[in-house]
Amino acid sequence: MLKFFKTWTLPISMLAGAIGYFVFANVTFLEPTKPFMYTLIAYLTPFLIFAQLLLTFCKISVRELMPSPWHGWLLLIQAISSLVLAALLLWLPMREEYRDVFEGAMVCLICPTATAAAVITGKLGGSASSLTTYTLLSNLLAAIVVPLVFPLVEPHAEITFFAAFLKILGKVFPLLLFPFFLALFLRRFMPPIHRFLAGLRDMAFYLWAVALAIVTGQTVKSLVNSEAEIYVEILIALGGLITCIAQFYWGKRIGTKYNDRISAGQALGQKNTVLAIWMSYTYLNPLSSVGPGSYVLWQNLFNSYQLWKKRKNELE
């Protein structure tokens, strides 16, 4: 049963999230619980993201973190590509539905590397330590860029840019960076707790599954309550596909020049989509969360193909 769940976690979690939303939206006797559930989810999602990052960073040593030239190039691609889309959203007049397409793509570009990317990288024959280093660096980049850009892209009349900047900074910066420093603190001053957390091999995986179900439910809610035409939702999903293809392509191309093609491809292409959906749903137009929501499918389809191809080559 456990093996079945691990194999089919992605569709099971997404299906559970979608069904969960429709149950709470349509079952009348659950109506009184809605305010509590909305509040719970608002706190639970960032907590699950924090816990995943903490468990991931507890498994690594600072001595394993090795900066590489390709790290700089990939960070530059992430920053420039997301800032270009932000500039288009700021200065190019466009209809609201097309803004959602660009917002969804922008989140897919600035979003940091997935915590599970090191596992896939190792299975594909890449350098897990180099990938983990980039995961930390991409978290730092997102923690800086997101609070600066999101309030400009999606301003609110009732709050100033500086107030919005501080609000997002206060939530995103600790969420992405504190897990690393907490892991270092536990390793140095509380070794028993650190060893316990590092020994929870599959816990981050299960936390990811729960978080994916929650953000899928939020994405479905955005789709159901949106007045946008179906073609707009398709365009947002296509934006996720284009950014997925582009990032895997450029990651692998740059990685080839430094003899680390697999690691660089996964570093730029495999995203922390739970975080991306949460950020777009919380700080941008909620409909834009369809972009990173579709990215979940695109990156997992590509990773499945890569793993299948590697197994096929090993058998030949």
Located regions from the model:
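Alpha-helical transmembrane segments of multi-pass small-molecule/ion transporters
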Residues: M1-E316
